[in-house]
């Protein structure tokens, strides 16, 4: 069964997602899927083997995808970047936690087996979820975004241009923008992660370069492992990575 979920998050923001539950089961595990930047969630296929053994909550954070009708931000990445209190990702990170609240509130969910997964922006959200909320039992990010902004500015064409452009727009030094970004940098969350992690990396990724993936990963002190795909960029071979992820979560079922 698939449900269309609408709920309120931090500062009264409306967010939506899809909640798929296994038929005829109780006390089932659940995985939260965090989406990439602006990516539209797919409707979960309840006929897959994965959906038969665990529930899935696919969530769109504020203003993105399922929530575009509520979008007041314009460009999400740069919105409110002048201050940590107004920056878009302050609210988006709270939406990440709100998704956990929803899953945890479901009576039929095994509260000890809630997992997180996602790629790019969703990979960053996965790591944030694991760092900020010990209700997550294990996480599987791939090609994670939002990590090591000092080097991102040099390595990431789009990110570098956005950061420099915002500094010019605000007529401030780039260091001022990077100071704001430090509050949302995955590097500064990684040390708080206590659950097991598996990470997938595309060695040819120019959007979220491998260097930035590992800058956060290397600071994780909990059990961790990674898989490198030498020929892939910002997308991994789906069947291969999904199998890695499935096998990883199976260890905790």
Language model regions located:
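N-terminal cap/lid segment of alpha/beta-hydrolase-fold proteins
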Residues: 1-25
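Cap/lid segment of the alpha/beta-hydrolase catalytic domain
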Residues: 42-94, 151-160
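Gly/Ser-rich "nucleophile elbow"/oxyanion-hole loop immediately N-terminal to the catalytic nucleophile
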Residues: 77-120
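Acidic catalytic loop of the alpha/beta-hydrolase fold
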Residues: 203-208, 235
């Amino acid at each position: 069964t698939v449900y269309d979920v609408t709920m309120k998050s931090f500062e009264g923001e409306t967010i939506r997602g899809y909640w798929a539950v296994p038929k005829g089961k109780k006390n089932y595990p659940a995985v939260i899927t965090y989406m990439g930047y602006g990516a539209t969630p797919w409707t979960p296929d309840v006929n897959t083997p994965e959906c038969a053994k665990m529930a899935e909550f696919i969530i769109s954070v504020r203003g993105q995808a399922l929530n575009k009708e509520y979008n007041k931000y314009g460009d999400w990445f740069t919105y409110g970047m002048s201050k940590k209190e107004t920056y878009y990702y302050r609210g988006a990170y709270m939406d990440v936690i709100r998704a956990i609240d929803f899953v945890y509130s479901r009576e039929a969910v095994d509260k000890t087996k809630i997992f997180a997964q996602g790629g790019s922006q969703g990979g960053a959200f996965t790591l944030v979820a694991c760092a900020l909320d010990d209700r997550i039992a294990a996480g599987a990010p791939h090609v994670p975004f939002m990590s090591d902004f000092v080097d991102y500015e040099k390595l990431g064409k789009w990110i570098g241009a956005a950061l420099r452009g915002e500094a010019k727009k605000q007529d401030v030094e780039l260091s001022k923008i990077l100071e704001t970004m430090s509050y949302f940098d995955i590097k500064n969350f990684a040390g708080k992660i206590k659950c097991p992690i598996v990470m997938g990396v595309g060695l040819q990724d120019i959007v979220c370069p491998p260097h930035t993936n590992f800058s956060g990963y290397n600071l994780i002190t909990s059990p961790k492992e990674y898989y490198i795909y030498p020929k892939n960029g910002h997308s991994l071979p789906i069947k291969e990575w999904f199998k890695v992820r499935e096998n990883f979560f199976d260890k905790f079922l």
